[in-house]
UniProtKB/Swiss-Prot annotation:
Protein name: Menaquinol:cytochrome c reductase iron-sulfur subunit
Cofactor binding remark: Binds 1 [2Fe-2S] cluster per subunit.
Keyword terms, alphabetized: 2Fe-2S, Disulfide bond, Electron transport, Iron, Iron-sulfur, Metal-binding, Oxidoreductase, Transport
Gene from which the chain derives: qcrA
Record-annotated membrane-spanning stretches: none
Cofactor(s) the protein needs: [2Fe-2S] cluster
Family label: Belongs to the Rieske iron-sulfur protein family.
Function, in words: Component of the menaquinol:cytochrome c reductase complex. The Rieske protein is a high potential 2Fe-2S protein.
Highest taxon, organism lineage: Bacteria
Gene Ontology cellular-component terms listed: plasma membrane
SS bond list: C105-C123
Residues that coordinate or bind [2Fe-2S] cluster: C100, H102, C121, H124
Residue ranges constituting the Rieske domain according to the UniProt record: 59-158
Subunit-level organization: The main subunits of the menaquinol:cytochrome c complex are a Rieske-type iron-sulfur protein (QcrA), a cytochrome b (QcrB) and a cytochrome c (QcrC).
Length: 167
């Protein structure tokens, strides 16, 4: 019924080496493909919001609030400390990151007597206006980041810090 199909030694080795070579090439290319597609495959879900302060405690003067977030890095989970300068600007709540956009130092509110009512970075004399905008002629080239925020049940919840105008 069916004829015997003989395969030569040369064809057998050719098929075997092609198969093994293809498997090895695929195993080398797979990490590169995964690396290239990783940003596309990441979830774009909103970061967990953390309760920081009661809205009733906020004033027109910026106040620093410290809070902690849970950070998962592969198999390692840790608690990371964060800070925010928070104040009311009319009906709006403003939450700014205290990280200077020049070299990553921490800014303070109203701490430089020569420049009152400004955020001041003591490392390289960087200045920011109350709304987080960088003062021209000082080292920072970008405004302070703004935190994602949400008010729920009378409390302010903060998420991820993003550059001004983004989000």
């Amino acid at each position: 019924m069916g004829g015997k199909h003989d395969i030569s030694r040369r064809q057998f080795l050719n098929y075997t080496l092609t198969g093994v070579g293809g498997f090895m090439a695929a195993s080398m290319l797979m990490p590169m493909v995964r690396f290239a597609l990783d940003p596309v495959l990441k979830s774009t879900g909103k970061q967990d919001m953390v309760q920081v302060v009661s809205v009733d405690e906020l004033t027109k003067e910026p106040q620093r609030f410290d809070f902690k977030i849970n950070q998962v890095d592969a198999w390692y989970e840790s608690e990371e400390s964060r800070s925010a300068w928070v104040f009311k600007n009319g009906d709006e709540i403003v939450a700014l990151s205290p990280i200077c956009k020049h070299l990553g130092c921490t800014v303070n509110w109203n701490s430089d007597p020569k420049n009152p009512n400004k955020f001041f970075c003591p490392c390289h004399y960087g200045l920011y206006e109350k709304d987080g905008t960088n003062v021209p002629g000082t080292p920072p080239l970008a405004p302070l980041d703004h935190y994602e925020q949400e008010v729920k049940d009378g409390f302010l919840y903060l998420g991820k810090a993003k550059p001004k105008g983004e989000g």
